């Protein structure tokens, strides 16, 4: 077994198995170091599947719809061997060798810093729990580095699920300071990760619906899209 682990999560009906298989294919084609591929899922059927825990699920309030994607917290527990972990959302396009992420200096975990955000808007909307500067579509951590995050969610689940519209918003309020651009999480550098729907770097490179193969990864994050509406658009670009 390799010390390097690439993780994804699939639950419900938003994504079918083709997304997991495509992500696995992309990783195999774009990673020059050995790695183990794992998918946390509520419907395990493959050798690489790990059954999702459910102990946080009881805190989710469907009528509020808050704190979606909380299931990502489950992967911060010790479910697999190895010391290096890279999480990828299912709807990403990998342009370059993800070996890069396993070789980053690991004084603290890495997460997507949405450089497409206007920092003044981020600060203005901070108390409204909107316009988060962080995005959890790609996270890189070493064993034990996200344990405190999982424990904080466990210890304060009722309040956290009630308060925060998203996991990203929770990260930005508890583990990152947008005024200082620092915290217990650090953002991937400019030029690493961009958004198909939101652009790249504010304000100089904000063209949307544009592939940037000189970057590592393209995200398909877009809160304005109805769930599933962007599926065919993503598949055309695979």
List PLM regions with ranges.
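N-terminal anchoring/stem segment of glycosyltransferases
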Residues: 1-61, 80-81, 222-229
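Short, solvent-exposed loop/turn segments at secondary-structure junctions
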Residues: 11-14, 43-46, 54-58, 92-94, ...
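Short, hydrophobic beta-strand segments that form beta-sheet elements in well-ordered domains
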Residues: 32-42, 86-88, 109-112, 181, ...
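GT-A fold catalytic core of metal-dependent nucleotide-sugar glycosyltransferases
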Residues: 45, 68-119
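A short, glycine-/small-residue-rich helix N-cap motif at loop->alpha-helix starts
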Residues: 58-71
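Short, P/G- and charge-enriched loop/turn segments at secondary-structure junctions
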Residues: 62-64, 122-129, 205-206
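Short beta-strand-to-loop element that shapes/binds the nucleotide-sugar donor at the catalytic cleft/hinge
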Residues: 110-140
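Catalytic core and acceptor-binding pocket of nucleotide-sugar-dependent glycosyltransferases
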Residues: 136-238
